[in-house]
């Protein structure tokens, strides 16, 4: 019994001890767990503190970098941002991560976010620098473009001035353009019929040149003399410029004067007050034959080659276009000035140019000289040869009768010279004849719309 009770007590005691042990074990586990919880909470607090410190550091670094970039922009110094902050921040982050044992994953994530924030801020700084540099470049470009624009304006104006100067400095001292080529050809042909060589004088308008008042001279009869006295004194003739020819024939029986006004040409330019050139009229006429009457021509002289006169023509047809350039070698000719005084004639007759040509042509076949008699509006042409006499009469229908009694004007002239200048039907429709006793006969022929040609024919005594 004692044995049984002892075993029972031992068993009960062992049971009690086991329970106590279990209780002790449970208490130890609870303490361990609480300790672990405390450690975990401490580690979390450390992590939070680290995060806050890192965020404050990053914000401070961002603010400092922004202020530094602003000051650098103000100073306009283009310096790239330094990368030392990155390396230092990375080192600090590595040290802090090494010190913290727990929650390494969270800390590394926070480090990555911090690095990304800093890198973003630095990228923003670089973008700001790039933007500022771009703005500076655009400003400089605008300034340079503005300068270039002003320079281009100056260049454009200078080019215009140069073109205007080139119009005057084109190596030409004389330039004349006209479309009335046929009229010029007729004038030179008529002059070459009686004169072998002569001087051509080119003058600009409104210049004081000797005998300038003779350019606009006119001839009138005695009946209209009194009505024009006041106009002569008040309206002084001016030099209209243009082309002048005045020349005596070799026998001194005929004087030819041509006045072509500058304003009647399409373009007339003469850089000198007076240019006089000697020309062989036969050569000039033969060269002009190669040019059509309808082709426009340009007459010019070069500054460096004043021994030649150039004539250029351009003919444009539907089929083709042809251009001709003639260089006429000039001659040294003495050109004596021959004054032509204004004269009041006794009578003036206006005839149709073709009628005048037919009369001279028919009379020249049977006679060498012609006797011209004028009474009022009638003019008589008489020719005599060994076979007989021929008289042809023409009446001026537009003649105005004079108040004075009838006057008879009579003179004998050489038919050859009259016939040469009677071929003027291509120049004008009518011809004017001025007559006066014991004075040269004057023919006034209009040269289309360019000017006039005056022919003075001296009378022959007793028909010899």
Swiss-Prot record:
Comp. bias regions, Acidic residues: 97-138
Entry keyword DNA-binding: yes
Record bears the keyword DNA-binding: yes
Biased composition range(s): Low complexity: 41-71
Key words, A-Z: DNA replication, DNA-binding
GO molecular function terms listed in the Swiss-Prot or TrEMBL record: DNA binding; DNA polymerase processivity factor activity
Region of interest (Disordered), residue spans: 1-168, 210-239
CDD domains assigned to the protein according to its UniProt record, in alphabetical order: PCNA
InterPro entries named in the record: DNA_clamp_sf, Pr_cel_nuc_antig, Pr_cel_nuc_antig_C, Pr_cel_nuc_antig_N
Regions of compositional bias (Basic residues) in chain numbering: 72-92
GO biological process, one term: regulation of DNA replication
PANTHER family referenced in this protein's UniProt entry, alphabetically: PROLIFERATING CELL NUCLEAR ANTIGEN
Family from the record: Belongs to the PCNA family.
Function: Sliding clamp subunit. Responsible for tethering the catalytic subunit of DNA polymerase to DNA during high-speed replication.
Listed name of the protein: Probable DNA polymerase sliding clamp
Species in which this protein is naturally found: Acanthamoeba polyphaga mimivirus (APMV)
């Amino acid at each position: 019994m004692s044995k049984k009770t002892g075993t029972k007590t031992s068993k009960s005691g062992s049971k009690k001890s086991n329970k106590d042990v279990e209780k002790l074990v449970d208490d130890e586990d609870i303490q361990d767990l609480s300790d672990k919880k405390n450690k975990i909470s401490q580690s979390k607090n450390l992590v939070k503190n680290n995060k806050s410190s890192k965020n404050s550091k990053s914000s401070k670094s961002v603010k400092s970098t922004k202020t530094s970039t602003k000051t650098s922009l103000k100073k306009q110094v283009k310096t790239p941002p330094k990368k030392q902050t990155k390396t230092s921040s990375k080192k600090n982050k590595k040290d802090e991560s090494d010190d913290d044992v727990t929650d390494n994953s969270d800390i590394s994530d926070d480090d990555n976010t911090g690095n990304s924030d800093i890198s973003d801020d630095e990228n923003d700084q670089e973008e700001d620098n790039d933007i500022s540099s771009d703005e500076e470049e655009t400003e400089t470009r605008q300034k340079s473009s503005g300068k270039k624009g002003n320079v281009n304006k100056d260049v454009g104006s200078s080019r215009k001035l140069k073109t205007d100067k080139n119009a005057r400095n084109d190596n030409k001292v004389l330039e004349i353009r006209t479309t009335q080529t046929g009229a010029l050809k007729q004038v030179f042909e008529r002059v070459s019929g009686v004169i072998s060589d002569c001087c051509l004088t080119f003058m600009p308008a409104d210049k004081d040149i000797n005998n300038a008042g003779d350019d606009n001279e006119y001839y009138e009869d005695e009946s209209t003399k009194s009505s024009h006295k006041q106009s002569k004194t008040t309206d002084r003739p001016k030099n209209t410029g243009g082309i002048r020819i005045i020349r005596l024939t070799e026998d001194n029986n005929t004087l030819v004067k041509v006045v072509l006004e500058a304003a009647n040409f399409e373009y007339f330019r003469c850089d000198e007050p007076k240019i006089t050139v000697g020309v062989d009229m036969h050569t000039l006429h033969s060269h002009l034959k190669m040019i059509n009457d309808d082709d426009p021509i340009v007459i010019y002289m070069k500054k460096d080659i004043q021994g030649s006169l150039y004539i250029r023509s351009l003919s444009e047809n539907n089929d083709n276009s042809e251009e001709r350039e003639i260089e006429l070698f000039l001659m040294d000719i003495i050109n004596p000035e021959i004054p032509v005084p204004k004269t009041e004639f006794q009578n003036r007759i206006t005839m149709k140019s073709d009628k005048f040509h037919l009369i001279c042509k028919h009379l020249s076949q049977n006679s060498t000289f012609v006797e011209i008699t004028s009474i009022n509006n009638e003019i008589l042409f008489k020719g005599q040869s060994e076979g007989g006499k021929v008289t042809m009469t023409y009446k001026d229908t537009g003649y105005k009768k004079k108040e004075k009694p009838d006057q008879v004007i009579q003179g004998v002239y050489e038919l050859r010279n009259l016939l040469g200048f009677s071929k003027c039907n291509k120049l004008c429709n009518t011809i004017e004849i001025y007559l006066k006793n014991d004075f040269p006969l004057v023919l006034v022929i209009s040269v289309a719309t360019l000017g006039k040609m005056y022919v003075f024919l001296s009378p022959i005594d007793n028909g010899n």
